[in-house]
């Protein structure tokens, strides 16, 4: 089965409305208000859609989040059963401080086709390569770079890698620098970071490192439409993380998840820019309109494009 084409516009609208709502808080130094505004707008729009939706990636578990929590049902409760993964405001600090990279993100798949990830860290690696064997979480940094360079018929110093700029990545960053790999260090936003491998125009050959598990699922949802390779392994820092994972049905705590184990079947992904970023531009005002850009993918229709939208300010 596949998702009806009508859902492209419906979920595009959801992403845009969440982005527009949080835009009012850009630069106001209040990341909580910016996030809440995006959450409220996204939830309201989702509840208008003729579907039986269930949140599998959201703002946390029921005891942590009043809205868009894991397991929450959304929609009119008629129509197809869908899994929904959301990050109404990726880059809360970016929005609060008017820095590049704030996004509103949603991914949708048919029921039971989207992995419900625990709120924990995930070690990730992705590249625009066709299959296993070229890069792998269990390979050394040197082997991953060497294999990727061979596959792309390049020298290691011609490759570019994207990684979150965190103390935990100090050793990896040093190894990449020793190999003369070009580095793009990002301060936050590992959904958009992973997406940079999707198209050669972004000039990023590999994304690697430890970031959020839910963000890994969202990134995989988009990369699936681009036939990219993605692999992730959850990292559990304490017993509470382990118990949460087991409660969600994760028995093998050391398992490496491939893209087709995170998302299967058809899917739609939307990411709307709030502030300027590498993938999409931020919201601008022209005359009496908000102008926004959204990356949208729909796997079954082979839709992969950036859509520019216009919304009247008084809407």
Give the ranges of each region predicted by the language model.
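N-terminal subdomain of lithium-sensitive/metallo-dependent phosphomonoesterases centered on the IMPase/IPPase/PAP
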Residues: 1-85, 146, 150-152, 177, ...
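Oxyanion/phosphate-interacting regions
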Residues: 7, 196-315
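General beta-strand structural signal in soluble alpha/beta enzymes
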Residues: 55-59, 84-86, 95-97, 116-117, ...
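Short acidic, glycine/serine/threonine-rich loops at helix termini
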Residues: 67-69, 97-99, 117-120, 172-177, ...
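DPxDG-like acidic metal-binding loop motif
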Residues: 79-90, 94-115
């Amino acid at each position: 089965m596949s998702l009806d084409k009508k859902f492209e516009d419906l979920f595009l609208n959801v992403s845009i409305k969440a982005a527009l709502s949080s835009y009012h808080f850009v630069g106001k130094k209040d990341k909580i208000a910016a996030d809440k505004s995006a959450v409220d707008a996204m939830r309201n729009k989702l509840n208008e859609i003729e579907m039986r939706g269930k949140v599998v990636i959201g703002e946390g578990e029921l005891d942590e989040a009043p809205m868009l929590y894991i397991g929450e049902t959304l929609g009119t409760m008629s129509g197809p059963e869908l899994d929904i993964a959301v990050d109404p405001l990726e880059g809360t600090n970016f929005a609060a401080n008017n820095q590049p990279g704030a996004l509103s993100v949603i991914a949708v798949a048919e029921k039971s086709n989207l992995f419900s990830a625990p709120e924990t860290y995930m070690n990730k690696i992705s590249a625009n390569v066709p299959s296993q064997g070229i890069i792998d979480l269990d390979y050394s940094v040197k082997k991953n770079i060497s294999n990727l360079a061979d596959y792309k018929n390049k020298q290691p110093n011609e490759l570019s890698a994207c990684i979150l700029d965190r103390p935990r990545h100090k050793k990896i960053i040093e190894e990449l620098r020793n190999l003369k790999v070009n580095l793009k260090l990002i301060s936050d936003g590992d959904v958009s970071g992973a997406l940079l491998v999707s198209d050669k125009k972004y000039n990023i050959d590999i994304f690697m490192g430890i970031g959020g598990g839910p963000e890994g699922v969202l990134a995989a949802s988009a990369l699936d439409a681009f036939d990219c390779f993605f692999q992730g392994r959850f990292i559990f820092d304490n017993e509470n993380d382990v118990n949460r994972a087991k409660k969600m049905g994760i028995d093998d705590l050391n398992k490496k998840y491939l893209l087709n184990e995170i998302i299967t079947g058809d899917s739609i992904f939307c990411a709307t820019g709030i502030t300027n970023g590498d993938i999409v531009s931020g919201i601008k005002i022209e005359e009496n309109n908000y102008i926004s850009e959204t990356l949208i993918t729909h796997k079954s229709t082979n839709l992969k494009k950036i859509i520019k939208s216009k919304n009247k300010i008084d809407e």
